[in-house]
Amino acid sequence: MSLQEILNPSIKTAIHQLFDLTIEKIEFQSTRKEFDGDITMVIFPLLKLIKTPQATPNGAKLNPADLGNKIGNYLVENVAQVEAFNVVSGFLNIVIANDYYINFFNTIKTDAQFGFVSPSEHDKAIMVEYSSPNTNKPLHLGHVRNNLLGYSVAEIIKASGKKVYKTQIINDRGIHICKSMLAWQKFGHSETPETSGLKGDKLVGKYYVAFDKAYKVEIAELMLQGKTEEEAKKQAPIIIEAQQMLLDWEAGKPAVMALWKTMNQWVYDGFATTYKNLGVNFDSYYYESNTYLLGKEVVQIGLDKGVFEKDPDGSVWIDLTQDGLDRKIVLRSDGTAVYMTQDIGTAIQRVKDFSDVGGMVYTVGNEQDYHFRVLFLILKKLGFDWASSLYHLSYGMVELPSGKMKSREGTVVDADDLMEEMTSTAQKLSEDLGKLESYSEEEKAILYKTIGLGALKYYILKVDPKKSMMFNPEESVDFAGNTGPFIQYTYARIQSILRKANFDITVTISTKLHPKEKELIKQIEMYPEVIQHAAANHSPALIANYIYDLVKEYNSFYQTVSILGEEDNDKKVFRVQLSKKVADTIKTAFTLLGIDVPERM
């Protein structure tokens, strides 16, 4: 039972007994460093509620100090864990007895799943969508942030006690795919990933670029012949051929379908390698080629319910002006679906495929904010009860400092290249620091990748998802400050202590706590609440910054007290136990961020 769970009913009882008042919510916060106390109750919200003859002789409202003192005295007299209190400007700072922290620590010190909640069979599952790439080019820096956010949010929600499914929708059809296919036919000379030595997604991306170059040449030639740029873009032979290929695909022409399947498989194989290196995975896959017709049958249901309306030209719309939005088309006049229709149908299909799904999280950039507001509102108006449990995990752009890691085309940073660069940067810094003499070459390679990818993931995930960010590769691999390697180094330092502790650390110890020990236990105690808060807010940044605070507290503890050199055996054992729990917490929290920790550095 957490400290808040102990204090909450006691304070409610105190208020009921003192003022004959029943309240629903008590507001707590951490006690500020400059004040004496372990947890603080905010008094202000109660002041306007309490006005009774028992409060003051004339029945006037209490001032903050009077109210705080009355509640504080009640807690000292009636709650064993409360040792003392003080009131500062409307805040009741509560001092908790040493025994509470000792007992709490002894209860959780060997709990490998501390902070994690097992899912209930009765709770609905959450489906988290992320990645969702096009199959005409490799994954890039934007996909990296998307994948890291989606994967981490899924893991955090799972740790909070929900069953989770990870999914993506792959945009495997359309004119952009046909551009790569046509360019390969024209310029590829039957090149394959095997003959070229390129990953499949990079090979297909190469021909997407080749198409664009050829297209620009044809546009320029037509403009020299007197065409306007707009006319040239429409009349260039290569774009007309690509459009015909799309029509052939839609008609199911065997040769086009065979090439489409072959080149898409090259891309999927390439993506699989990138996902494996990035450390993300999926439980299910949806393909636009299978889903683009979904939702059309829902349009008729919407018309029958009066949710949708048909225009004279036969197109179908929904009028959301009363909801502060616009009219939105859901079916074109020629009967073809739009993206919104497809997304409606895909959401419904997912609930059919996974009957226990009761909510979904869509990890998509903030340029799609309006799209998801409309999508969720349409699904609600169609009467789906799970529509109220849909969430758009909107995130900002991620950029690199100018001149850093530009791709050959000078526009997009390739995800594979970024991971390789991070590993190389980690290698250079590690070699400069030394201490690698005892490592085999294989161990070094694993260490460099662990540090490099840990730096990349932590630097991205520590930022509030809603904010745009600048990713600085060199800064992210720094071994000091709010970085992944700094936290990994602290974990490795603790593992070194544990290897040197050649004595039994499983015994139960009761000792007077040093202030630094108490602060560490208080920080550890916050972990379950942080997980719940991060899940509710879909924010890995809350986990990342919690771990940074824990590591800062541990390093202060490490600098202040003696651990293995402590002469008092009980204190020595307790400090090693405490160190181990900090390491365990770092490790489990980093799993929520998809980050590995090295046993030594």
UniProtKB/Swiss-Prot annotation:
| Record-level GO cellular component terms | cytoplasm
Q: Give the enzyme's EC designation.
A: 6.1.1.19
Keywords associated with the record: Aminoacyl-tRNA synthetase, ATP-binding, Cytoplasm, Ligase, Nucleotide-binding, Protein biosynthesis
Which subcellular locations apply to this protein?
Cytoplasm
UniProt enzyme class: ligase
- Coiled coil (UniProt feature): none
- Bridged cysteine pairs (disulfide): none
Q: Name one GO molecular function term.
A: arginine-tRNA ligase activity
Question: What is an annotated GO biological process for this record, any one?
Answer: arginyl-tRNA aminoacylation
- Gene3D superfamilies the UniProt entry points to: Arginyl tRNA synthetase N-terminal domain, HUPs, Isoleucyl-tRNA Synthetase, Domain 1
| Catalytic function, reaction form | tRNA(Arg) + L-arginine + ATP = L-arginyl-tRNA(Arg) + AMP + diphosphate
* InterPro entries named in the record: aa-tRNA-synth_I_CS, Arg-tRNA-ligase, Arg-tRNA-synth_N, Arg-tRNA-synth_N_sf, ArgRS_core, DALR_anticod-bd, Rossmann-like_a/b/a_fold, tRNAsynth_Ia_anticodon-bd
One Pfam match, given by its short name, reads tRNA-synt_1d
- The molecule here is called Arginine--tRNA ligase
Q: Identify the species of origin.
A: Flavobacterium psychrophilum (strain ATCC 49511 / DSM 21280 / CIP 103535 / JIP02/86)
Q: Which gene encodes it?
A: argS
